[in-house]
């Protein structure tokens, strides 16, 4: 919120409000309603509550090599793809000109793109959308770069697309984004994400000092970076312009993913204090992950289902801006669930085991 403006500032306020309301509903309202229900004899029976069943302990820590290799392969593939094809930055971050038109009939976006590129002598992006409520059709032409458009060029573009497509286009809005404004927006977005990582490390280090503090914080952030890179590569592979939607998706994924990771760490801390030295680190993670697995999957499935419905509706009704948001969000949610289950815990085990080996070496050297 400090570094945001416009839609990002609105998203920040909405996200903060949702977190506060969710906290009140989850901590107070749900407890109040449950206590109210169990006062009745009909509901105060064992059959209404699921018994805790003995579960087979899954060996997540033993399979960490396979999880790490899978993630490395995905990230390496995405990196190579991005290096070869490049990322598509939106005008919001690069600067440029945005032309908006309303029209009737049909618009050939491929033909319009070629005609406009011939006029301005640079690459352009052409998108169409339709308001499902009013039926109004819109055409958006985006020109990235430092060069602006003269009034003569704007008039020529309007005349050309009207002649070539036999439609009645009318100029709705013309806006220019200065390059320094785009660079500032990109810088602020990066700062906001980096600061969120730092606060997460500090918070987890203080809350989970029993788990090594810094180790748990760093491994949690590594899992988050994994998710953000996956989302970034989705933007690149599907040629989605990187704009404030990327920042919104990133912050949303960070929230959901770190929540699952904290639940896992909390269970590890609980078992570690109860079992003391009876279990190894790998066994602690296996038991804790198995116990929180169903909760993580159920939560992720609910959110993924909502994101999938939004994605399908946006594709059917050709709401491109919503599609460009919901598709990366959908993949990011799946990645967040995977990283919190298969990356965060096993990575913490690897870190702690490696640290213990170093300490033993130092102790052995001192004795000599």
Give residue ranges: language-model regions.
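A structural signal for conserved, well-ordered secondary-structure elements
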Residues: 1-368
């Amino acid at each position: 919120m400090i570094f945001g403006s416009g839609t990002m500032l609105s998203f920040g306020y909405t996200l903060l409000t949702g977190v506060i309301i969710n906290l009140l509903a989850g901590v107070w309202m749900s407890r109040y309603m449950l206590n109210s229900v169990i006062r009745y004899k009909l509901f105060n029976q064992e059959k209404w509550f699921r018994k805790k069943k003995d579960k087979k302990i899954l060996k997540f820590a033993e399979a960490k090599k396979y999880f790490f290799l899978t993630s490395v392969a995905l990230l390496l593939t995405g990196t190579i793809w991005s290096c070869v094809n490049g990322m598509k930055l939106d005008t919001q971050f690069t600067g440029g000109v945005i032309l908006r038109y309303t029209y009737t009939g049909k618009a050939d976006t491929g033909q319009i793109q070629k005609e406009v590129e011939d006029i301005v002598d640079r690459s352009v992006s052409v998108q169409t959308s339709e308001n499902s409520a009013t039926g109004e059709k819109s055409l958006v032409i985006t020109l990235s770069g430092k060069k602006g458009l003269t009034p003569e060029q704007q008039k020529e573009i309007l005349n050309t697309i009207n002649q070539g497509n036999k439609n009645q286009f009318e100029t709705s809005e013309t806006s220019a984004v200065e390059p320094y404004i785009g660079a500032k927006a990109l810088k602020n977005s990066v700062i906001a994400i980096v600061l969120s990582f730092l606060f997460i490390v500090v918070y987890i280090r203080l809350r989970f000092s029993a788990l090594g503090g810094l180790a748990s914080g760093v491994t949690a952030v590594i899992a988050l970076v994994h998710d953000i890179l996956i989302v970034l590569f989705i933007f690149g592979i599907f040629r989605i312009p990187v704009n404030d939607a990327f920042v919104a998706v990133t912050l949303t994924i960070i929230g959901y993913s770190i929540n699952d990771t904290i639940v896992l760490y909390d269970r590890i801390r609980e078992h570690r204090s109860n079992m003391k030295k009876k279990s190894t680190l790998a066994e602690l993670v296996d038991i804790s992950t198995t116990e929180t697995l169903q909760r993580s999957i159920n939560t992720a499935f609910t959110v993924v289902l909502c994101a999938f419905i939004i994605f399908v509706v946006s594709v059917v009704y050709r709401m491109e801006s919503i599609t460009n948001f919901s598709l990366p969000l959908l993949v990011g949610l799946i990645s967040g669930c995977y990283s919190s289950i298969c990356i965060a815990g096993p990575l913490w085990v690897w870190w702690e085991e490696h640290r213990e080996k170093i300490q033993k070496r130092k102790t052995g050297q001192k004795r000599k």
